[in-house]
């Protein structure tokens, strides 16, 4: 049919519809716009993304409409978090911390109970652990240890609930369909209904309805991009500001702890100086009422010792293995507390179920000895590394003059009574808290050693020398002998004095007094917090100090007046001897000279003028 003939027939709609009968086949649907065009389209055509339907969707029987919200997955996440928090509150009524294994158990139980709401691949404990990792990143839960960045499913890792801030959840979902032209709106709505069954976790900070069309208005695109960028930047600012506030609070808390430690150190030193007489304190921080100077002094002591978050630890699975071995092995069961305390003293302590790989069969005594010896070696290696092979012992080298005077005046004095215990309590409180905690763990380990005979002889299972019927005494001596060089400064005490000092520490811990503040110290702290100063209770002696002076008398008046108690008058001396005594007094009172230089000058004076030394400076060296 030609085109001229076609246009010659008039078009009448009624006639056309009357011609088409009921049995006439209907014409095919009109193809989409642009298919039959001969010329190239103005815009490049984009084919729709192929979206596979979900497994539980039925292609043929799609009679039941799906009325799910696009925030269904977000609601599911909120329900999971609410269930998790309720379960934690029921499980831990009085404690705010929970273990990684408990968190994984709770979330796995929820997923198993609501398995119909999750894809088949997302059911199981491994997916619960993955979700807990996401919660840890989004601050829904927080690790107790700051260096723990990854969630660990273990009984030895502890967490706490975080804030209720919005979080960006990242899950593996099919790629979302992109918007097309208006002609594809029907297919897009069907595909969106199918994609609702993916259980995607939505977040208000995820950009949605992004358009790749080049024909959109640039202002709208800029507005959308700007709003999304603002949301993301707001989230980043919120998280960064919260982290900064957290760091500030932690820093302020640490500063308060340091100042409190400095006050305890200062007042403990004052009370200790009322029990012992020390001539030179240049190596010890002078007792001044300045908490900042004392705090910096304690920080310098703590900086010499290798303690902190950088210390190595076992893998959580290895720790679980050690727990199981110590609690269930028949050879270790009776000494399980001793081994657990050894693990507190040496976190890297680890041994296999069969520590000896040799041809001959190991006896039970030998195997237990190897385990006990491995525990002692692990503690020794840790202290050796922590103290730099004893150069920075747990009782700092700066306290050597105090320890020496405690040994000479209290330990050697059989009639010292409670003075020795009180002095040990004061000098223990003067040690910085992290080091004090390590000393307390060692004392507790020795205390457990004294209470059990289940630990094998640490010298040898076949030791043929003289043995004490109570095996623990020999083991205590072995432990003290191998660890004392890392506990005390070198040369400040003899071996016998070190044994008595450690026995005093153990006795104080058995009575519950180790680490506790004596009544006099508590009253001094209260008086200082209320009045800002303390009225020092002086001894019965004559001196020139003021009534409210805090420092003991021998540090508040000139050295000449102190020495005048035991020294003779210079009236009967000739001019030369009087000048020599005055010169030595000026040397002792000179603050610019070091302790070594003063001792050297006194030794030379004693060598060349022994009579003057014995008359005016007895016992100064």
From Swiss-Prot:
Biased composition (Basic and acidic residues): 52-61, 214-224
Matches recorded under InterPro entries: WH-like_DNA-bd_sf
Region (Required for localization to cell cortex and cleavage furrow): 236-514
GO biological process entries: positive regulation of apoptotic process; regulation of asymmetric cell division
Record keywords: Chromosome, Cytoplasm, Cytoskeleton, Kinase, Nucleus, Transferase
GO molecular function, one term: kinase activity
Gene Ontology CC annotations of this record: centrosome; chromosome; cytoplasm; midbody; nucleus
Region (Disordered): 19-76, 178-197, 209-228
Compositionally biased intervals (Low complexity): 184-197
Subcellular location: Cytoplasm; Nucleus; Cytoplasm, Cytoskeleton, Microtubule organizing center, Centrosome; Midbody
Effect of residue 159 to D: In gm396; ectopic A/PVM-like neurons
Disruption-associated phenotype: RNAi-mediated knockdown causes formation of ectopic A/PVM-like neurons.
Location of the DEP domain: 72-164
Domain notes: DEP domain is required for function, perhaps regulating the apoptotic fate of the Q.pp neuroblast, but appears dispensable for subcellular localization.
Function: Involved in promoting a consistent pattern of asymmetric cell division and fate assignment, perhaps by regulating apoptosis of specific cells, including in the Q neuroblast lineage. Downstream target of MAP kinase mpk-1.
Name of this chain's protein: Target of ERK kinase mpk-1
């Amino acid at each position: 049919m030609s085109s001229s003939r076609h246009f010659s027939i008039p078009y009448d709609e009624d006639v056309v519809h009357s011609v088409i009968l009921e049995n006439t086949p209907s014409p095919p649907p009109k193809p989409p716009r642009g298919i039959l065009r001969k010329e190239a389209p103005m815009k490049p055509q984009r084919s729709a993304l192929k979206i596979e339907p979900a497994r539980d969707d039925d292609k043929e029987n799609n009679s039941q409409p799906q009325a799910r919200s696009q925030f269904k997955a977000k609601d599911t996440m909120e329900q999971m978090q609410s269930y998790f928090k309720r379960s934690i509150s029921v499980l831990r009524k009085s404690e705010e911390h929970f273990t990684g294994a408990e968190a994984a158990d709770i979330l796995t139980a929820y997923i198993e109970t609501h398995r119909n709401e999750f894809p088949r691949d997302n059911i199981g404990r491994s997916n619960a652990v993955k979700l807990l990792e996401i919660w840890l990143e989004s601050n829904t839960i927080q690790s107790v240890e700051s260096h723990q960045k990854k969630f660990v499913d273990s009984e030895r890792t502890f967490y706490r609930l975080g804030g209720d801030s919005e979080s960006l959840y990242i899950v593996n979902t099919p790629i979302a369909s992109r918007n097309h032209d208006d002609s594809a709106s029907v297919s897009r709505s069907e595909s969106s209904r199918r994609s609702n069954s993916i259980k995607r976790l939505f977040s208000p900070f995820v950009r949605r309805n992004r358009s790749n069309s080049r024909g959109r208005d640039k202002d709208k695109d800029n507005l959308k991009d700007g709003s999304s960028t603002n949301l993301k930047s707001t989230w980043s600012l919120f998280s960064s500001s919260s982290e900064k506030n957290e760091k500030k609070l932690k820093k302020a808390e640490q500063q308060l702890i340091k100042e409190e430690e400095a006050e305890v150190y200062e007042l403990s030193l004052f009370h200790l100086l009322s029990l012992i007489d020390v001539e030179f304190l240049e190596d010890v921080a002078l007792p001044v009422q300045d908490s900042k100077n004392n705090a910096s002094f304690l920080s310098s002591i703590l900086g010499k010792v290798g303690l902190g978050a950088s210390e190595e630890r076992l893998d959580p699975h290895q720790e679980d293995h050690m727990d199981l071995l110590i609690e269930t092995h028949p050879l270790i069961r009776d000494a399980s507390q001793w081994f657990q305390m050894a693990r507190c003293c040496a976190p890297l302590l680890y041994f296999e179920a069969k520590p000896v790989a040799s041809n001959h069969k190991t006896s039970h005594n030998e195997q237990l000895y190897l385990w006990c010896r491995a525990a002692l070696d692990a503690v020794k290696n840790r202290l050796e590394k922590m103290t730099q092979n004893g150069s920075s012992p747990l009782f700092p080298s700066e306290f050597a003059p105090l320890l020496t005077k405690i040994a000479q005046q209290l330990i050697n004095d059989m009639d010292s009574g409670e003075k020795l215990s009180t002095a040990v309590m004061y000098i223990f409180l003067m040690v910085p808290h992290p080091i004090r905690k390590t000393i307390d763990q060692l004392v507790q380990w020795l205390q457990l050693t004294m209470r059990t005979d289940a630990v094998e002889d640490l010298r040898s299972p076949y030791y043929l020398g003289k043995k004490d019927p109570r095996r623990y005494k020999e083991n205590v001596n072995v432990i003290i002998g191998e660890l004392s060089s890392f506990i005390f400064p070198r040369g400040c005490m003899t071996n016998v004095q070190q044994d008595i000092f450690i026995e005093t520490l153990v006795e104080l811990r058995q009575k519950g007094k180790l680490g506790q503040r004596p009544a006099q110290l508590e009253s001094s702290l209260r008086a200082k917090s209320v009045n800002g100063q303390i009225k020092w209770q002086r001894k019965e002696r004559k001196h020139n100090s003021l009534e409210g002076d805090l420092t003991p008398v021998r540090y508040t008046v000139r050295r000449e007046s102190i020495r005048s108690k035991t020294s003779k008058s210079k009236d009967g001396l000739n001019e030369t001897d009087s000048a020599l005594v005055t010169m030595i007094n000026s040397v002792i009172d000179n603050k610019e000279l070091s302790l070594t230089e003063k001792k050297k000058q006194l030794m030379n004076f004693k060598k060349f003028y022994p009579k003057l030394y014995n008359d005016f400076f007895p016992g100064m060296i």
